Swiss-Prot record:
Pfam families: Ribosomal_L12, Ribosomal_L12_N. Forms part of the ribosomal stalk which helps the ribosome interact with GTP-bound translation factors. Is thus essential for accurate translation. GO terms for cellular component: cytoplasm; ribonucleoprotein complex; ribosome. It comes from the Bacteria. This is Large ribosomal subunit protein bL12. PANTHER family: 39S RIBOSOMAL PROTEIN L12, LARGE RIBOSOMAL SUBUNIT PROTEIN BL12M. Keywords: Ribonucleoprotein, Ribosomal protein.
């Protein structure tokens, strides 16, 4: 360890010109290059990565099961969709069924929590 400390101390005392000369000498002696390898990213690889990183902004709210409180779920679906009572009941009876499409994340989460509070099972897609 003492030898390594001495080498470190000697290297630290080198001027920039001396360090460059040392690099050349070592490259020649060991047959290596100190230059960092250059990598070029392919546009075909970068595009899918950028898409994967972006967060989804619009969601589809899907009712997968009604649960025990079917009447309450129908009322919530009626309020969310603006449908009449009969249309809302039909939609709930046809579960799994899409309730609302192209909604923002916050609205989708709110709809999901309302339906789940009524005992329904909901997926966001």
């Amino acid at each position: 360890m003492a030898d390594l400390a001495k080498i470190e101390e000697q290297l630290s005392s080198l001027t920039l010109m001396q360090a460059a000369e040392l690099v050349k000498m070592l490259e020649e002696k060991w047959g290596v290059s100190a230059a960092a390898p250059i990598t070029v990213a392919s546009a075909g690889v970068a595009a899918p990565l950028a898409e994967a990183v972006t967060e989804k902004t619009e969601f589809e709210v899907v009712l997968t099961a009604t649960g025990d409180k079917k009447v309450e779920v129908i009322k919530i679906v009626k309020d969310i969709t603006g449908l009449g009572l009969i249309e809302a009941k039909k939609l709930v009876d046809e579960a799994p069924k899409s309730i609302k499409n192209n909604v923002k994340k916050a609205e989708a989460e709110e709809i999901k929590s309302k339906l789940e509070a009524a005992g329904a099972k909901v997926e966001l897609k």
